[in-house]
Design a protein with these regions (language model features):
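Hydrophobic transmembrane alpha-helices and their helix-loop junctions in integral membrane proteins
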Residues: 1-153, 157-182
Length: 182
């Protein structure tokens, strides 16, 4: 939970406070490399999350994909992209630890298994947990009217003027996140 909530945000904070203000030419020079790494992170993290049978690994791989979108926003060199990256980082800092808590602390303590297929029918036995898990999964998916959606939209819209291909490849995270969340 600490990794998803805090440690991943240290890199974002470091890029915002140190790298972009002190080395703006280097950021613009290496932005194609960073954008490529962000797209690879989005696609690889999402496809790996689709194949997971372990709930905690699924949440971890979704975090990798979301941080790829944050990198796309940070290195878009636009105000909209950077604002979207900040918003997505904050939203991810609330949603991802909540999912880790629900999977690790609540379900694993009761069933001693993290295999997804063993969790069928939990709505009958744990209705409050199911409602909370549904809420945070919908937020993690980036559905409209959630902060994750606004952050993803701003990040990808910030990348679009500079590099439409990267923005479209990054937008695959929207479809793939729906696939692994369902």
């Amino acid at each position: 939970m600490i990794l998803a909530g805090l440690v991943l945000k240290f890199a974002v904070y470091g890029i915002l406070r140190v790298l972009i203000p002190m080395l703006p030419e280097a950021c613009s020079y290496y932005s194609p490399l960073a954008l490529t790494m962000g797209v690879i992170s989005v696609i690889y993290g999402s496809l790996t999350a689709i194949r997971q049978t372990d709930f905690k690994c699924l949440v971890a791989m979704s975090s990798v994909a979301h941080m790829g979108v944050v990198i796309l926003g940070l290195f878009s060199n636009t105000v909209m992209g950077i604002e979207g990256a900040i918003l997505l980082s904050i939203a991810h800092g609330f949603v991802s630890p909540a999912l880790f808590f629900l999977v690790g602390a609540v379900v694993y303590d009761r069933f001693h298994s993290r295999v997804i297929r063993y969790y069928r029918g939990l709505t009958v036995y744990m209705p409050v947990f199911s409602a909370m898990f549904f809420f945070f999964t919908v937020a993690n998916m980036g559905t409209p009217s959630t902060a994750n959606w606004v952050g993803e939209y701003l990040s990808l819209a910030g990348v679009f003027p500079a590099n439409p291909v990267v923005s479209l490849l990054g937008a695959t995270s929207i479809i793939l996140s729906a696939c692994y969340s369902i």
